[in-house]
Amino acid sequence: MHCDVLWHNARLMTLDAGDGGLGSVDDGVVACQDGTIVYAGPAADAPPLQASHVHDCQRRWISPGLIDCHTHLVYAGNRANEFEQRLRGASYAQIAAAGGGIVATVRATRAADDAALLAASLPRLDALLAEGVTTLEIKSGYGLTLEDEIKQLRVARQLATLRQVEVVPTFLGAHAVPPGAQGQTYIDAVCQEMIPAVAAQGLAEAVDVFCEHLAFSPAQAEQVFVAARAHGLQIKIHAEQLSNQHGAALAARYGALSADHIEYLDQAGIDAMANAGTVAVLLPGAFYFTRDTQLPPIPALRAAGVPLALATDCNPGTSPLTSPLLAMNMAATLFRMTVDGCITGFTREAARALGRGNRLGRLRAGMQCDLAIWDIDAPADLVYRMGFNPLHTRVWRGHPC
């Protein structure tokens, strides 16, 4: 069999084991043709392979490229001053009353043109790529007007032309009520004007909504889901982060790809997600940064068979995090997730959360050849160590980059 590229003398995390674990292979090879894996597995079982380019991995570990399935990466402005204010005792309400909070990011994002927004976002993207990310989702939600939401989505797509990475854009117009607007009037505009325009221009694959007492009600979230479905867009939700609004169960009834945060999720929501195949996306960075104490119901989610993904939730207000490796450590330390669970959360299950489980997140024939090659002794090193980046090579669609 001929192939473009062959990586050999490697240890593999295939993420393709029947038991749902890492699918480790001690002496493995990965063969790629035209950006697609044609063989991944034990060297002893490989067919005869003739490669144009051969890489001796010298016993390094190869995993699928990491997937960050929940980010708000495209925004302008800096809210480090709010962090200082909170450390000095200011409340979120006091900061918001002084013009801070999400309104500050909305103001800065609206004021930035495409070039400025791109320049602000590229370093954050590069930080993710430096730790092995090959696919990421980017949400809008800091424009809150049709023009500015489209600007964010346009910049998200432009990022993918400047770096070797797959960007999955999500429309999050229902992130917050913009200053001076009335909630229901704004949601009507999201559903009647913004979603049709975003869909017509092909700017997003999915629609997200922040369903919470300080954002949008379940009834308003359902209105968004109906509009999304009518325009052929997938559904996601920020749910049960601060209280149980039963948003995850609602989203599951609409076949949502994922429900994210879910600290206050109840058993009915878990059951609904399990029945719908909706992925739980856990966001330990936000949990850590906001000093939350309400743990997501991980044992119950596992027992119900709900897939558990992880993400950085990169955003300026509650998770200014651009390190998937640190997010794994946070998930292990704060959520008591296993090493296997942390790694599957940023690979196989993250792919499912983006509707890409059929082509990303595993090493097997037919999958896209997105790889992360690591200088580590064991997979646990990816989760155990902090401030440590052992990435040797990132491979996107068969090309080392």
Curated annotation (Swiss-Prot):
Binding residue positions for Fe(3+): 70, 72, 238, 313
Recorded superkingdom: Bacteria
Protein purpose: Catalyzes the hydrolytic cleavage of the carbon-nitrogen bond in imidazolone-5-propanoate to yield N-formimidoyl-L-glutamate. It is the third step in the universal histidine degradation pathway.
Binding site for N-formimidoyl-L-glutamate: 142, 315, 317
Protein name: Imidazolonepropionase
Gene3D superfamilies reported in the protein's UniProt record: Metal-dependent hydrolases (3.20.20.140), Urease, subunit C, domain 1 (2.30.40.10)
Binding site for Zn(2+): 70, 72, 238, 313
The protein's enzyme class: hydrolase
BP GO terms, sorted: L-histidine catabolic process; L-histidine catabolic process to glutamate and formamide; L-histidine catabolic process to glutamate and formate
Organism: Xanthomonas campestris pv. campestris (strain ATCC 33913 / DSM 3586 / NCPPB 528 / LMG 568 / P 25)
Compartment(s): Cytoplasm
InterPro entries in the record: Amidohydro-rel, HutI, Metal-dep_hydrolase_composite, Metal_Hydrolase
Gene Ontology molecular function terms on file: imidazolonepropionase activity; iron ion binding; zinc ion binding
Record GO cellular component, one term: cytoplasm
Cofactor: Zn(2+); Fe(3+)
Catalysed reaction, written as an equation: 4-imidazolone-5-propanoate + H2O = N-formimidoyl-L-glutamate
